[in-house]
């Protein structure tokens, strides 16, 4: 096959299979991945049925899978892969509400991460994303598939005493605590489990930075809102901080909190910006963490969940300096132990907890 690099396949490299019905996307992704000395494209497939045959035959280390295809669509293909040949899968997704919803469902079904399929001049925009694409493939090749259990019907797992009818017009009170959360690869699944475990009356505002392409965070917010006792929304410029509400940074925007006080009165609000990426990410966990450390000091509880690289560690240092608490997800429940691992390596964690123990500990702290 013309897109393969036989010489590299003989070495200790990550063996990638690309499944996409677009010949252009297959070629562009192949060109990008084959330029990375640690990755070799061992095959391509034109639809899900073809992809399953190639997975059976080639046994790749990572599959890049289009979410919308003829013959056998991405979700059905993913389900077969995870049931028959568990393999780290990265969803290659188009924009649009339908595609974004399918992608989030795929993440629930066992996909590890998502990359955006650009619109417009495909080849040019794809090559601009080359570094991110290669980094994700390298990271997901190390994913712990034991922690990719599906989180379906999560609403039924929420204790009855945690549920209440949501009220978008909550009584405005000063924010007593701030829970700041950072996540990357594996994060959407972890967030569903964590946010769905909080009681409605938790005395804290919740701020989340999840590394995702633009558009997907809006769909993620709606999905979490439907499965949580808390109100969950994609953050907007000027949103007023309030307890019992979860604010998710929109894709491609940094999220900070600013204090608007005049003569001692005013409210803390969300500020969004398109400033430079930090550690290759926008939104950045570090940007959020530094912001809440400055304003809330010892009232901050920060969580660093599953994810690649080390975003959040520098910000966690600032939170510690200001008297706040830092919680890192234990490796036993992480899909990728990059971000929380860096917290532990720097000795910044007050607690190191598996995902299913976090909510109870946080409720104890804030109450």
Curated annotation (Swiss-Prot):
Pfam short name (any one): CheB_methylest
Coarse class of the protein's main subcellular location: cytoplasm
Compartments where located: Cytoplasm
Post-translational modification: Phosphorylated by CheA. Phosphorylation of the N-terminal regulatory domain activates the methylesterase activity.
Role: Involved in chemotaxis. Part of a chemotaxis signal transduction system that modulates chemotaxis in response to various stimuli. Catalyzes the demethylation of specific methylglutamate residues introduced into the chemoreceptors (methyl-accepting chemotaxis proteins or MCP) by CheR. Also mediates the irreversible deamidation of specific glutamine residues to glutamic acid.
Domain text: Contains a C-terminal catalytic domain, and an N-terminal region which modulates catalytic activity.
Full protein name: Protein-glutamate methylesterase/protein-glutamine glutaminase 2
Organism of provenance: Methanosarcina mazei (strain ATCC BAA-159 / DSM 3647 / Goe1 / Go1 / JCM 11833 / OCM 88) (Methanosarcina frisia)
Gene name of the encoded protein: cheB2
């Amino acid at each position: 096959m013309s897109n393969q690099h036989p010489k590299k396949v003989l070495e200790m490299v990550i063996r990638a299979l690309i499944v996409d019905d677009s010949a252009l996307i297959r070629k562009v992704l192949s060109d990008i991945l084959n330029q990375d000395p640690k990755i070799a494209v061992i095959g391509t497939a034109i639809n899900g049925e073809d992809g399953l045959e190639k997975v059976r035959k080639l046994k790749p280390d990572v599959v890049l899978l289009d979410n919308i295809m003829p013959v056998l669509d991405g979700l059905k293909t993913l389900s077969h892969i995870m049931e028959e040949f568990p393999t780290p899968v990265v969803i290659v997704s188009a924009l649009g509400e339908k595609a974004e919803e399918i992608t989030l469902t795929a993440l629930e079904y066992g996909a590890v991460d998502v990359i955006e399929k650009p619109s417009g001049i495909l080849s040019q925009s794809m090559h601009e994303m080359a570094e991110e694409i290669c980094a994700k493939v390298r990271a997901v090749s190390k994913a712990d598939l034991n922690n990719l259990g599906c989180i379906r019907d999560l609403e039924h797992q929420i204790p009855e005493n945690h549920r209440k009818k949501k009220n978008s017009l909550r009584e405005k009170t000063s924010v007593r605590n701030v829970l700041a959360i950072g996540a990357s690869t594996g994060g959407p699944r972890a967030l569903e489990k964590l946010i769905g475990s909080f009681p409605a009356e938790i005395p804290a505002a919740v701020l989340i930075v999840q590394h995702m392409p633009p558009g997907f965070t809006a769909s993620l917010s709606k999905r979490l809102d439907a499965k949580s006792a808390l109100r969950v929304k994609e953050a907007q410029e000027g949103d007023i901080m309030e307890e019992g509400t979860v604010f998710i940074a929109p894709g491609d925007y940094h999220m900070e909190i600013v204090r608007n006080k005049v003569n001692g009165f005013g409210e803390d609000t969300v500020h969004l910006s398109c400033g430079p990426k930090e550690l290759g990410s926008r939104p950045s966990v570090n940007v959020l963490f530094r912001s809440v450390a400055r304003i809330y000091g010892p009232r901050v509880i920060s969580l660093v969940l599953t994810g690649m690289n080390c975003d959040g560690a520098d910000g966690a240092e600032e939170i510690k300096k200001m008297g706040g608490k830092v919680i890192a997800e234990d490796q036993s429940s992480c899909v990728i132990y990059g971000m929380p691992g860096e917290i532990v390596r720097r000795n910044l964690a007050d607690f190191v907890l598996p995902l299913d123990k976090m909510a109870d500990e946080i409720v104890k702290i804030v109450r």
